[in-house]
Amino acid sequence: MITASMSLIAQAAPLLIAACAALISEYVGLLNVGIEGLMLLSAFAGISGILLTESLGGLIPGLAIALVLGAGLSMFITALAVYRKANIYILGLSINLTGAGFVSVLSTRLFGNRSIVALPPELLLQPQLVKTVSAALAVLTGLGLALFCRYTKTGVRIKILGKDAAFLDSIGVHTARLKIAAMGMSGAAAAAAGCLLSLQLGALVPNQSAGKGWIALVLAYAGGRSVVGTICAALLFVYLENAIAAAQIGMEHPALLIGLPFVLGLFLIIAEKLIIRLWKRYRGK
């Protein structure tokens, strides 16, 4: 039972961490729709960094490059939104739309290959080690975010920011800087999720993120905008994926079942918004 649970957590780790990234951005009222592109770019940055800094240890410098990229891009687009009144959703979508193109071009330039960039055997981590690290990182991310938002002054302010920024302004909090810092955390978490995807495969492949960034946004809503709820939603989603993948063996149209979790996620968002609207209308009477 414990082994199966840890295996599920390890498999869900990239999605779980990406969902935490989405949740942080939701707290500050600036939904990070660029998570999909950040995951893809960071997966490429992580693999490229490991290969290009092999003489310096490879793994740590490569992951550091990816985290800095994810945090930096998120902070940059947030600064544009806060100080220049740019539309952060358009900026996030631009990261998603251009990410795949950048990865393809840079992959060809650096490695002469626009399809699969694999780590050499000497740089590959053992599968069991990757699974252990993935599970540990998922647990630490979820637990750390929950404790941070509950017991630290900055975390509490981040949760308040999206609901009542005027109150924080009134007590002297620099809300613009807090938004940028929080979105940097969101970008770093998205980058960590992207790196895990590439480390679990030991390679960079086209469309590495495969829609996980979008699913993460759904899970942040489906989890009721709470850390525990978001984690449970991510684990449930991966469990359903596994169950459906097992059930579709021998079926004539397996794609219908494979797409069921995505349809379920969309249904949860629509249902939640409908329930909230009906509740507000009922309370208004």
Regions found by a protein language model. Give the residues of each.
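Single transmembrane alpha-helix segments in multi-pass membrane proteins
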Residues: T3-G57, L63, V68-Y89, Y221-S226
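Helix-loop-helix "hairpin" substructures at the membrane interface of multi-pass membrane proteins
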Residues: Q128-L204, V227-C232
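Inter-helical junctions in multi-pass inner-membrane proteins, predominant
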Residues: T3-S7, C149, S186-V218, M251-L257
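Transmembrane alpha-helical segments in multi-pass inner-membrane proteins
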Residues: L204-F262
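Loop-to-transmembrane alpha-helix initiation sites
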Residues: Y89-I90, I116-P120, K131-A136, K179, ...
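Cytosolic-side transmembrane-helix boundaries in multi-pass membrane proteins
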Residues: G144-L145, C149, K163-R177, I244-K285
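Transmembrane helix-bundle core of multi-pass membrane transporters
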Residues: I88, G92, G99-Y151, V205-P206, ...
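Hydrophobic core segments of alpha-helical transmembrane domains in multi-pass membrane transport
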Residues: A18-A19, A43-I47, A100-S104, A135-L147, ...
